[in-house]
Amino acid sequence: ANADSVIWENTANSSTSNYVLKLNGTDHITLKNITFKNVGANYSQKIVLSGVTDSVTIDSSKFIGTVTNSSSSNYVSIYGYDAAATGLKIKNSTFTDGGWYAILLNSNNSSSSPTGLEISGNTFTNTYNGIYAKYFDAVTIRGNTIKGSEMYDYGLNLEYCDGANVIEGNTIYSPQLTYGIYLNYCQATSGNEATIANNLISVEDHGIYLNYYNYYQNMYYNSVKVRDSYALFTYSGSSNNTLINNILLTESTGDAAAYFYNTSVVTNSDYNDFYTAYAYPIYSNGNKTLVQWQAYGYDSSSVSIDPFYNTDSTLVPTSYILDNKGTLIADITDDMYGNSRSVTTPDMGAMEFTVEGSALAGSYTVGSGGDYDSISTALSDLAVYGISGPVTFNIQAGTYDDAVALGQVYGASATNTITFQSADANADSVVWENTANSSTSNYVLKLNGTDHITLKNITFKNQGSSYSQKIVLTGVTDSVMIDSTKFIGTVTNSSSSNYASIHGNGADATGLKIKNSSFTDGGNYAILLNSNNSSSSPTGLEISGNTFTNTYSGIYAKYFDALTIRGNTIKGSYMYDYGLNLEYCDGANVVEDNTIYAPNLDYGIYLNYCQAASGSEATIINNLISVEGNGIYIDYYNYYQNVYYNSVNVRVGYALYTSYGSSNNTLKNNILLTESTSSVAAYMYNTSVFTSSDHNDFYTEYAYPIHYSGYKTLEQWQAYGQDSSSVSIDPMYDSDSSLVPASYILD
């Protein structure tokens, strides 16, 4: 009863001799405790099945093949092409090395596929692929282990396998595998569903992949981790499937945890954990947050929580928040290890687990001798345990070299907020830093869908030579506040976004507030925000009371509506492109009381496709702009922008420029000066740009203060019905930095 003691072997050298044992229509045979070995250089099949067989059992055997990463079927250990093998059982055996698949079975009988196939309790190591079955109905694949660094394509691959298949209790841990479990045209029926349950899948790309036309597949209690794609993928034609009590995690920063081809793929989906390092855990006709997916009527009790798997090979969750979050499924009473499931609060995933601890609430000290010795350990507990009340982390003086990513914190709300702040209310005393050397590590703090968090009185520092982002926002966030902080970057004149201090490309950040902070050095923009949400742009963005020094450009916002940018100072001789740049920012924006003094800037305030409405106008008011190129630049299709009481001084370009498609704007009480001897103070694309323009001062060293359909004197411009009370007087600004007029005439 020892497979090692009997070695049945062949060294095949041709396709006709490529077997150790060939069963052609053989019935009722058992092969037990035997080692089958075929190490031919190009041919390595061991058992070959052909014809119609019944009740072949292969038990407690070993299969040793040729070490290869070939995808040729010549290396398959158990090969059955045209094998209508009813009652075939392959169990308790080991498969080592080989190519293409360890087991490849294709009955080629689509009209009356054989039944009773059972593959159970086997171990597959470095066999390129695991198991392939085609045209076998009501198969059972249970308790197998598929592992190894030389596995490449499929763990389990079933095609046209109909009926009540059972795929249960399998471990697929192979870091190179493209697919864990792959199904194609596997069709069960109502009342006779297939089951995919209690499987542990840890692979490279896809965990569970339902390709075309798979019906009535019940996916319960699976634990999945993938590194580079979707934990669950469903495709065209699949329907009436069920997804309950699964943990689906991808480490990808660009993919959802689950891809639903449409909302008909699953008829019942709930009590799942969809977690991704990307901003959106679900894809269904576009990227979706869990809340957006729930609006379709699915997953009302599901979550998006990092399970904090203990290792890639065992996938035991260590998240306190995730404990006891499943729901009872009557037909599945045990986990993959045979432990009884809780009858009231079972766990999601392949195994029952218990995590001791409690949710955080109250105040904690971070630093030497505190409750947490580092910021990263505090953030880890936030993620693992969640919160049950307001939480404040008081950080002791010191330098903390902690690059940390934080996702959604369970329990956070408008009442239960999270605050990280220096203990002595002094930003200089707490330096939170990183020296990034790649795009993937380019942050000090990354907030991925994090809500209701305040960062106060902290210095964020990232001085990587090519990467210098400090706070990175991704996903859908609500009520993030950054207050009284300092941002120190790399001295550079690069326009690369790798140097942006606050970077949010794809950050759908409602209620984001950045205030009373200082930004020093950097490239591209100090603050770069693009929600990428054109249909329902976030609101409540406030950037106020900040100082930007030599940050190449100041503030960029795209697809943020009704924003406020107030009381900021943008200055320095290393500012080159934009002070403020707003694109597709609609509604009643307020751009007010900002000082932009940077002698090399191309644009002070730049607007593109910013569209307000009558009765809810945007305001650009009380701004001081002293730059090189253009002061206020109203580019394409900007509506209802009220431009009041601004002082502008430019050296080369236009103090005011308007372009195609803009209309219904108002221009009043502005001083618009250019020092250029060849440029006008104001360039009017047409007379519709401003429906009302008056009480302005247009002054230039050039002969004509206005351009509209050619160069115009003020009187010629007034003939079009605009600016009857405006003037063209040198304001005699006291200095380029303060722009206080000294002209008695202008008073």
Give the predicted meaning of each segment:
Residues 293, 337, 358-395, 399-405, ...:
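Acidic Gly/Asp/Thr-rich repetitive segments characteristic of extracellular carbohydrate-active
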Residues 3, 16, 23-26, 31, ...:
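Parallel beta-helix/beta-solenoid
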Residues 2-3, 251-253, 274-280, 326-329, ...:
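Acidic glycine-/aspartate-rich tracts in secreted/extracellular proteins
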Residues 10-22, 40-50, 69-82, 97-114, ...:
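Extracellular beta-strand/beta-solenoid scaffold signature
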Residues 1-42, 65-70, 75, 303-307, ...:
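Right-handed parallel beta-helix/beta-spiral solenoid domain characteristic of secreted/periplasmic
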Residues 287-306, 316-358, 711-732, 736-747:
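Surface beta-loop-beta hairpin patches that serve as ligand-binding interfaces in beta-rich domains
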